[in-house]
């Protein structure tokens, strides 16, 4: 038997799909040449058949003289027709073993590594098997760009395993949801309405700020951020800032926590009766105008009402006729009610009544018709000395 026949016999011993041992003969930048043990033929092991990382260094995976188990993929004929070479793969052999290990592991949580952002989701690798996480299963919120997960290792839940169709689907969202639920239950177990706790500002919206309480986000509504009115949330807090907040309400079923920042600091109405009293005359700024009056800020955070009837001695239909927002005015305090957080004010109490108006009132009083004075009924006798006549003189000529 000649050398060529020996070569053919050795080739016949190698079949596509076989798992064989191979010794590394040489290594260059992109591939390694191996000798398939017991056959007398060689194989080619490319970087692509070693790892999914296209930027990897092949020397990190194989060394000359090292013996590896590889999977025979197909026969490759070289330029010399007498030379037969096989393309082999270490990566696919490991993947086959990994697929076998995946059978029956649906719903199990495993750690994967993100390899590439693709259309519709993220490619990941787990023990040599390439898997896929749809974008809708990456997070609790839809992820439009999966690039941030590339190169990251994270826990996922196995949802589908089908080796024949090379289908390996996982979900990161379910793991995140489970972790969030566990953290939420733990946090809710420690919280109570009325507690003052420390949290970190997670995000700011037009209607308030969300505070991270260590697993649960609570909302400080715009109205609970400050004692001042019409403030912008961004002017009160900043993202990342740690603040103390008071718990107003808890709803574990809905995962909702209502918080207040202003309840943790003294309010403008605290001790207001020592700062403001009935009869005081103070300067203020018109803050708001309504149909029934004007609200004037007399102390920081304290607006008093000047009723429309207290704006001027003249009759006005609308406060806008006499005042405008931002105007500085002098007012007299008519009443202070700290419990009701109400202050009544007057502008006209500091103004003299117009002389013309006083004259008109006097004229009205003078022109008013006087009612006749009632005469008292009296029983009396007319003495003769007063009339000069006696009763006989008055009725003497009357014939009966």
Curated annotation (Swiss-Prot):
Quick check: keyword Ribosomal protein in the entry? yes
Post-translational changes noted in the entry: Phosphorylated.
Q: Which GO terms describe its cellular component?
A: cytosolic small ribosomal subunit
Tell me the Pfam families matching this sequence. S1
Q: Which UniProt keywords apply?
A: Phosphoprotein, Repeat, Ribonucleoprotein, Ribosomal protein, RNA-binding
Q: Which family does it belong to?
A: Belongs to the bacterial ribosomal protein bS1 family.
Q: Name one GO molecular function term.
A: structural constituent of ribosome
Residue segments, region Disordered? 351-400
What is this protein's record name?
Small ribosomal subunit protein bS1
- What superkingdom does the record give? Bacteria
Q: Tell me the Gene3D superfamilies matching this sequence.
A: Nucleic acid-binding proteins
């Amino acid at each position: 038997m000649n050398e060529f026949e020996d070569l053919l016999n050795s080739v016949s011993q190698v079949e596509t799909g076989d798992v064989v041992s191979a010794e590394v003969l040489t290594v260059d930048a992109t591939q390694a040449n191996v000798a398939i043990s017991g056959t007398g033929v060689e194989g080619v092991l490319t970087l692509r058949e070693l790892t999914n990382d296209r930027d990897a260094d092949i020397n990190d995976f194989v060394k000359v003289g090292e013996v590896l188990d590889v999977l025979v993929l197909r026969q490759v004929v070289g330029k010399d027709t007498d030379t037969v070479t096989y393309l082999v793969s270490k990566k696919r052999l490991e993947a086959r073993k990994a697929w076998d290990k995946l059978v029956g592991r649906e719903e199990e949580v495993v750690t994967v590594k993100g390899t590439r952002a693709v259309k519709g989701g993220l490619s990941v690798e787990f023990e040599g098997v390439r898997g896929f996480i749809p974008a809708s299963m990456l997070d609790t919120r839809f992820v439009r760009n999966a690039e941030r997960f590339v190169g990251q290792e994270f826990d996922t839940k196995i949802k589908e395993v089908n080796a024949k169709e090379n289908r390996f689907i996982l979900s990161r969202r379910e793991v995140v949801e489970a972790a969030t639920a566990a953290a939420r239950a733990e946090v809710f177990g420690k919280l109570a309405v009325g507690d003052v706790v420390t949290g970190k500002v997670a995000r700011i919206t037009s209607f308030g700020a969300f505070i991270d309480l260590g697993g649960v986000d609570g909302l400080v509504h715009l109205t609970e951020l400050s004692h001042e009115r019409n403030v912008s949330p961004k002017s009160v807090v900043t993202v990342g800032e740690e603040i103390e907040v008071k718990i107003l309400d808890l709803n574990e079923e809905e995962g909702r926590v209502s918080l207040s920042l202003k309840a943790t600091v003294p309010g403008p109405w605290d001790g207001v009766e020592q700062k403001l009293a009935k009869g005081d005359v103070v300067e203020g700024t018109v803050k708001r105008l309504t149909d029934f009056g004007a609200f004037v800020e007399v102390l920081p955070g304290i607006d008093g009402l000047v009723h429309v009837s207290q704006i001027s001695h003249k009759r006005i239909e609308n406060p806008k006729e006499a005042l405008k927002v931002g105007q500085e005015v002098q007012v007299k305090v008519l009443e202070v009610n700290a419990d009701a957080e109400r202050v009544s004010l007057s502008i006209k109490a500091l103004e003299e009544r117009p002389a013309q108006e006083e004259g008109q009132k006097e004229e009205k009083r003078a022109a008013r018709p006087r009612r006749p004075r009632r005469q008292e009924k009296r029983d009396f006798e007319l003495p003769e000395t007063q009339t000069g006549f006696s009763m006989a003189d008055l009725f003497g000529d009357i014939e009966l």
